[in-house]
Amino acid sequence: MKKLYTTGWSDYELIDAGGGKKLERWGEIITIRPEIQAYFKSAKPVAEWLKIAHWEFIETGAQASVWKPIKIDAPVAWSIQYGDLVFQLKLTKFKHVGLFPEQRTNWDFIHAHLNPSAKFMNLFAYTGAASLVAKKTGAETIHVDSVKQLISWASENMAASRLDAIKWVHEDALKFAAREVNRGNQYDGIVMDPPAWGIGAKKEKWKLEDKLDDLLHNAKQLIKQKGFLILNTYSPKVDGKTVALLAKKYFGDRNFEVSELWMRTTTGKELYYGNVLRVYTA
């Protein structure tokens, strides 16, 4: 399968990885986080990592974890930029800081394929990086997420980036997509970044392998003939072959490609970040 390499930028650097961890720079703040794909030996010894890192996320048990400060007065919240966009970052209890920088390649794709007359929808939109990129082009932008706190975070990112008029939808993404199909609405661009698993507001279980067919069924009806779709998958139970088969089922009459998403560290290691489906017009 094709490897799609994404890259960092001035405010983000994947410095090194190995031993089940990765070393990253976010602006001036450096973190150490767990990384299941970093099953190899790191280029630099961990002792070297600890000399420059500000925070390390440590898993102390099956359900317990903590951010350990390495430098005195290390900030728990800060911001970085991507071009004119500003992303507010902060330490969360789930090891994340509010941004998936490997998505940079998809942000660039969105920017290249939208214009001010376009209509764009971001499903499972998290803190809204793709929404900001879309809005920056002037496109009408709809941001859908089931977690209210994440929508608030995305709104802060919008304000910090001096943008406005993103439409916020606090709802289950799959249910909202199905309703949009029933309404007959269509989009010039759609991004879907569904979690591998989760538990909904009403305690319903979410497993990507059980929902992927429905997601793509809806997406087929929601994207315009000359529109595009980006789907990211991270689940070990949904491999590239599965995504390709479903893509052929729903988009066999269009151009599409399924790729493995990778990023190289500054030290020359390579990390795998799941699979990406892109449906587009050549």
Role assignments for model-derived ranges:
Residues 8-24, 31-99, 108:
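Non-catalytic substrate-recognition/targeting regions of SAM-dependent transferases
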Residues 173-252:
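S-adenosylmethionine
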Residues 127-139:
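Conserved SAM-binding loop of SAM-dependent methyltransferases across substrates and taxa
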